[in-house]
Design a protein with these regions (language model features):
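Core catalytic alpha/beta fold that binds nucleotide/phospho-ligands
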Residues: 1-170
Length: 170
């Protein structure tokens, strides 16, 4: 899996962020994958994919200040989040009991929740289910500080103030 991130002005609208994320993807596909004229389509649940035979899998995300994409020969998902206030009830709707305990015991519960959120969103994008599947259906653990979920290779980092996560089928 290759991940690509680009800083953008924080004042961009959602449409401008969307367009910049796709511009990044098209540039990456041309320059690094040799795909000059990609045709992007979407599944019924909204997962973007490249039309054609033997095309790589793609995922895109954007948030205030950055756009990103992931490209892989396997199913892939990427998510970026700008830090924001989160209600406690959001964690209860998204996380398993073990994940909630981890969040509550963290020195920075808001940051820990956003870590789980971006990881779970990247997994749902990888699966192609988006928000149609309950995030409580799977539990992320951390082994030696690295996120883990059977069947997936997970990546997480704080990119400046942003939370960035990616998932790829193992």
């Amino acid at each position: 899996m290759r991940r690509y991130v680009e800083n953008v002005p924080p004042s961009l609208t959602q449409k401008e962020l969307h367009d910049r994320a796709y511009a990044l993807l098209y540039r990456v596909l041309k320059d690094e994958w040799g795909i000059a004229s990609p045709v992007v389509e979407k599944t019924p649940l909204g997962k973007p994919y490249l039309k054609g035979e033997n095309m790589p899998h793609i995922s895109l995300s954007h948030t205030k200040g950055i756009v990103c994409c992931a490209v892989s020969r396997k199913n892939v998902g990427i998510d970026a989040e700008y830090p924001r206030r989160v209600r406690g009830s959001a964690a209860e709707r998204v996380c398993t009991p073990a994940e909630l305990r981890d969040i509550q015991s963290s020195p920075n519960p808001a940051a820990r929740f956003l870590t789980y959120w971006t990881l779970k969103e990247s997994i749902s994008k990888c699966r192609g289910t988006g928000l149609s599947e309950s995030f409580q259906n799977y539990e992320i653990t951390f082994e030696n500080g690295m996120p883990h979920l059977n069947g997936y290779t997970l990546f997480f980092e704080q990119y400046g103030v942003h939370f960035l996560a990616a998932a790829e089928e193992a």
